[in-house]
């Protein structure tokens, strides 16, 4: 009831069958953890494959309405920052009970939506645990030294893109690329809980 009440006050409500989860807000300055995970073509992609001055790691999935609501905005960001910032999407959901998040469905979505970034499958869920990811979407921005600079929401209105007034992830990326500190409060991302095994 408390969660429902809070969300109504924020102007939206959540299906009773959905578990709304808030990001754990991992400590700033934490290092990016190494990984080697298959993309939608079955090719392994590693942390070391990314060499831009900024790296955005996003834990997401196909079926979550929160993830789907911001998907087009993430694609726009990925296109806007090509050559300046690397983006990588990772799905860590267990797929026996959530078949829409299977590698086959991930490949379909990657192609249909023309993702400008790789979409990786974390079958063991070890990468999500290493990063401290708990929800979809859960967003982490790292600097050129792969230290965490930002962990928070994409913007200030996940549900209504036309009413967004603060694009916080874009603001954070711009700060990192220019070598400036992120000088605004970082608000936790919220979404569906990662579906653990």
Model-based region annotation:
Residues 16-186, 193-197:
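Chalcogenol-based redox active-site neighborhoods
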């Amino acid at each position: 009831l408390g969660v429902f009440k809070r969300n109504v006050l924020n102007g939206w409500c959540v299906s009773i069958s959905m578990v709304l989860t808030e990001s754990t807000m991992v400590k700033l300055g934490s290092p990016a953890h190494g990984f080697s995970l298959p993309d939608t073509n079955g090719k392994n992609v590693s942390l070391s494959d990314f060499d831009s001055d900024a790296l955005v790691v996003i834990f997401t999935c196909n079926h979550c309405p929160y993830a789907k609501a911001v998907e087009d905005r993430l694609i726009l960001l990925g296109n806007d920052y090509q050559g300046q910032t690397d983006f990588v999407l990772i799905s860590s959901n267990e797929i026996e009970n959530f078949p829409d998040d299977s590698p086959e469905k991930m490949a379909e979505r990657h192609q249909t939506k023309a993702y400008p970034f790789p979409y990786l499958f974390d079958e063991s869920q070890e990468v999500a645990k290493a990063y401290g990811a708990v929800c979809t979407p859960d967003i982490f921005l790292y600097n050129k030294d792969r230290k965490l600079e930002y962990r928070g929401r994409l913007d200030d209105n996940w549900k209504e893109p036309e009413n967004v007034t603060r694009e916080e992830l874009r603001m954070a990326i711009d700060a990192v690329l220019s070598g400036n500190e992120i000088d605004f409060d970082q608000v936790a991302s919220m979404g569906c809980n990662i579906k653990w095994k």
